[in-house]
């Protein structure tokens, strides 16, 4: 079965495809004998929210690191705004990364710094702003993620979901063009997950950024994505808008959506242990 390699979503008015903000073609990366990315090709349109799903160890985080220039591919192409990322020198890559805001799994906050100082950190490094301008921007970002009034608190005084949102505020503080979310809802309860999803949707709507999110959480993926792509065994095996993705007949997609233990995705998993003896069957 040939693997679908769709490009960025068409323009609704003209039917033409917009120029990709992110263009990835035949991307390959191995670590020693292990092939992690095996010919990944996908485009992300300007202001699109792409969600990449897939099991643990399928290369989702490795793909993000190539987009931002933290890893260099073995072969293939990664372009952002038409610029080949791997060709950037040290000085150029520093400037290039200012295009991005990245929110990590656990927030990745500085524990010894207040919320305010955490959010202000990229502004102090990347922007020439007065103290008053920085304070105004920090308060604006905290309001965007629904965290008014917590600026003086330490990360240890916040819940897990609040720490994630502080990470979001820091990620958008310097007004990036592209947002990368790494497992934004992992380990959170369903109510907090729904709130995180609402905040991501609000940020996308307000800031019009191009967004790439990696997640295991299918309900979250269906809520926040304009398009969902599935990575398995080093390849993009399917991609479609959320409602179309739900209806895809590919058994790998359906196994992942429904969280089934048995199916084609389980073929590479180690064999399950033999069934335990029933209780009471042990010899004394």
Name what the model sees in each region:
Residues 68:
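Helix-to-loop junction immediately C-terminal to a conserved catalytic motif
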Residues 154-158, 162:
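Conserved ABC ATPase signature
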Residues 175:
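Conserved catalytic motifs of ABC-family nucleotide-binding domains
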Residues 179-182:
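Catalytic Walker B motif of ABC-type/P-loop ATPase nucleotide-binding domains
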């Amino acid at each position: 079965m040939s693997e679908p390699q769709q490009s960025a979503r068409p323009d609704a008015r003209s039917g033409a495809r917009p120029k990709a903000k992110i263009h990835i073609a035949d991307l390959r990366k191995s670590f020693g004998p292990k092939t992690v990315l095996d010919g990944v090709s996908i485009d992300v349109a300007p202001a699109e929210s792409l969600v990449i799903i897939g099991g643990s160890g399928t290369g989702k985080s490795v793909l993000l690191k190539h987009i931002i220039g933290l890893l260099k591919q073995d072969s293939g192409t990664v372009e952002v705004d038409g610029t080949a990322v791997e060709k950037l020198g040290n000085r150029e890559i520093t400037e290039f990364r200012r295009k991005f805001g990245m929110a990590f799994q656990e927030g990745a906050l500085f524990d010894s710094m207040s919320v305010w100082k955490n959010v202000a950190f990229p502004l102090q490094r990347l922007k020439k702003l007065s103290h008053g301008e920085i304070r105004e921007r920090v308060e604006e970002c905290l309001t965007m993620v629904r965290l008014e009034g917590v600026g003086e608190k330490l990360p240890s005084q916040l819940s897990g979901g609040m720490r994630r949102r502080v990470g979001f505020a820091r990620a958008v503080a310097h007004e990036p063009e592209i947002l990368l979310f790494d497992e934004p809802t992992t380990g959170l309860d369903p109510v907090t997950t729904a709130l995180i999803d609402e905040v991501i949707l609000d940020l996308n709507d307000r800031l019009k950024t191009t967004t790439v999110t990696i997640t295991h959480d299918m309900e979250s993926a269906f809520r926040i994505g304009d398009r969902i792509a599935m990575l398995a065994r080093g390849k993009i095996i399917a991609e479609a808008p959320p409602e179309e993705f739900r209806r895809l007949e590919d058994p790998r997609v359906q196994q992942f959506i429904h969280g089934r233990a048995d199916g084609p995705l389980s073929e590479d998993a180690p064999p399950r242990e033999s069934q335990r003896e029933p209780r009471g069957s042990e010899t004394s």
